[in-house]
Amino acid sequence: MKNTKPKVRLWSVLTGLTAILTVAAIVGNIIANQYATTINVALNASTYKIIHGENTGDTEYFKKGFASDEEREAYEAELCATVEAEGAALLKNENNALPLASGAKVSLFGHGSVDLMYGGTGSGSVDTSKAPNLKQALEAQGITINQTLWDLYSSDSMMSKYSRMTPASISDTLEANTQYAVNEAPWSALSSAESSFAEYGDAAIVVLSRSGGEGADLPSGENGTSDSWISGQEGDGNYLALSAEEVELLQNLKALKDNGTFKNIIVLINSSNAIELDFLNPEICGEDYGIDAAMWIGDVGQTGINGVGQLLSGAVTPSGSLVDTYLYDNMANPAMYNFYTQAYPNAAEYNLLTEGADVQGMYSVYQEGIYLGYRYFETRYEDVVMGTAKAGDYNWATTVAYPFGYGDSYTTFAYSNFNVTESDDAFTVTLKVTNTGKTFSGKETVQIYFQSPYTAYDKANGIEKAAAELCGFAKTDVLAPGASEDVTITVPKSELRTYDANNAKTYIVDAGDYYFTAATDSHNAVNNILAAKGYTVENTNGRMTENGNTDLVWKWTNDTLDTTTFSTGANGTAITNLFDESDPNKSSDAPGSVTWMSRSDWTGTIPTAPAQLTANETLAASLAFTKYDGSEANSVEMPTLGAKNGLTLASMIGKDFDDPEWDTLLDQLTYSEMVNTITLGFHNTAAAASIGKTATKDENGPQGLTAALTGGASAMCYTSEDVMAATFNVDLINEVGRCIGEDCLAMGYSGLYGPGINMHRTAYCGRNFEYYSEDPFVAGTICAAEVQGIQSKGVYVYLKHVALNDSETSRRGVNTWLNEQTAREIYLEVADKAITDGGAWSVMTGFNRWGATWCGANANLLTGFLRGELGMRGMCITDFSGSSQYMDLVDGLIAGSDIWDSPTPKIHTTKAANYENDAYIVTQMRNAMHHILYTVVNSNAMNGWASTDTLKTITPWWQTAIYALIAVLAVLTILCAWQLSKAIKAKKSMVDTAPAADQK
């Protein structure tokens, strides 16, 4: 028989290959285990199983409100459309352009017409791949669309060449701004469809869309942005101005309107970032584009465009009101001069560099103070009208296109029987609202504003006052022509307080005259108050834009300065200065002095360039990643760990936060359980077997439940938050919240990263779609209603981002400087209302620093303000912290942070290993676990759990699969190596016996 040649080469290759695969699997397993938390969340992989004990009670603590997923989804689709229909604001409507006549035939223009902005980008983005488009929404209302033009805009060639461009990733740098592009199609690209225009000439509807997103602020043209990038051909680098192609489009449509091809031109503003509206006013822009109607629709969410269709067709009458001041030129906003971050000019001298996700040498100054949005535009207007010294050269009418609160209707309304009564702790405003139109039914938003006196005491102590502040609102039911409704609005006296940071160092109520008025918008409110003071258009030489209505004004006089009524917070906590270290004029870090904008000297204090600060040794030391030096390690007794007390987390259902039994439960925790829960909190809270704690799933976001980062289940995408606020409808947004809670309950989520509560400081913040407004009152009131709805289904919210994350540029560590009055009255007010009125459980802190102190390590913010003054009992989670060293574990724990939004043990888990014997830090961990567990035990995570149930740790299936793969590959490697060894021996044997064979 012929001998078979040994297969040495084959077995060598197979042995090498299986060995490489084995090593790769082992390395992959190591890497996967570092991201086990993220993988478990993404794959919905359990790390435990429940061992049920005896129980006869109902453990479904939070019940679903829908019989099926289909019922829930259908209801929410209608709800989203309703929010859009009540939130969109009609800005202009001439020549009866709107509503469209029944059966109208229209042409849709602009790339945005086929590619709407449904929401922003980043962690709050949602899947809208199945969302209806504008064509479908209009056709559902009996409107016929120019199919030829639609097909052209939506063709592959047009979509690839002229699509809107946005930043490709979350980068947080100024350079990301240059990735935004309008990229509108030039008029010449539409020539093939021009012959179809006349047949669909009832209206030319132009959609102007602008995108925003996480990690990238919008370019204003003031930051070196390439002109050519913004428009596709030419422009001024301002993303919120019309591009050259958009101007060309409007010019050509005007020509076609003039020759009779189109009857009307209608513009839809599809953006949560306020576009400059000079093009709507020929006297401002110098050219008449023939625009008959304009409507702001924001970001429409998954089905909100159906609401737009209802508005355009007249099925619903517009009732939304703007929640931002819209300008002709956005640079008229004083905050713009300090919006984009600055570098300390001597940062390198102190090694304050940006390394990876740690920004050390960048800062931003809120130099405008409380004068955000209408608080500036209307206050300076009042001072100009009254002839106040140093008011300067300011013309409201050429600055403001549409004021905060503005919203037109297809009908008209009248207010009468205005009355205000005072009680011990509130003012009650009543009035009658009548639909005075003859054709359309509709709702009306009633807005109540007040004015606080700007006194000599204020001027002496650096207190600023706005000419008007929103303090109450209500929305009527649908009123038929001629119908009326009596409206009652309660204004708590706490709305009148102002913060005195320099003398009383608490909230005060000034002595003097206070004015209350019912108004249609902020400008109307100031004119009413001016009228009550005796000012008219005539006696101010036209400085007043229109006469106010004194019948809608009521004056209340406070006889003496009150420094005590509002000087205490929750549980009697004294309210006093907490944020001096964020004020460069008071901070021990002394980066320099800042002149705050003041109405006592508009001309001398309005910024004309960014505020200049410099670094020093003290500031550099305050910016160190870790300040704790271990000196407190033995200052407290080491907490008990790993006790066998027999309690489970479910046994704490219904127990008060201060119940002594919590200590017994906390004694059972192990150090590793605390570290795992605290340092690996990316979209979850971890299971803890010692107390029978289940793992929970947390997810974004501001427009509804989305799993953009983890790949899990998503649900209804509602409108952007500004559209929600623009409804001015508390009950409607409470229902949105309830349905978001239903989505979470149906899909197994217990926590929601949202709502977003930062401010629209300027129009250029990338995440304005996630935030409600420039005004903290409407933002806080609407947020509180949404929070109540969400949490009614056992879903704890994380209000984000507390606080001052009002821009994206350099956000990972930027030093934010502001004074205390501004912090409290503007930037913390939404959280205040959401927690005290809405009962919000938890917060997510910002990436940014307050002065030199990271939000999550700011004890005055977390422990002093949130837990002390507001009485918050839930948890404080960081923003994403997996790659940032400045978001320090020990400093954060000491300040009051509880859980780090990190998917990897690389930084914080590793650091925790150094503190197992530090009693002080272990105590802080125990306190953090108390906050976490108290939140979870009051959530839907406890559905199905009884006090007798326990938990057993198991290996998740994907880890078992990897271990099995490694084992199989290892066995194959051994077998291949064995076969290789045999082959080598056989080959050697053949070589050794070859001569003998030859001799035969």
Predicted regions and their residues:
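Terminal connector regions
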Residues: K493-F566
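Glycoside hydrolase catalytic-domain context in secreted enzymes
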Residues: M1-Y499, D510-F516, S522, G572-K1000
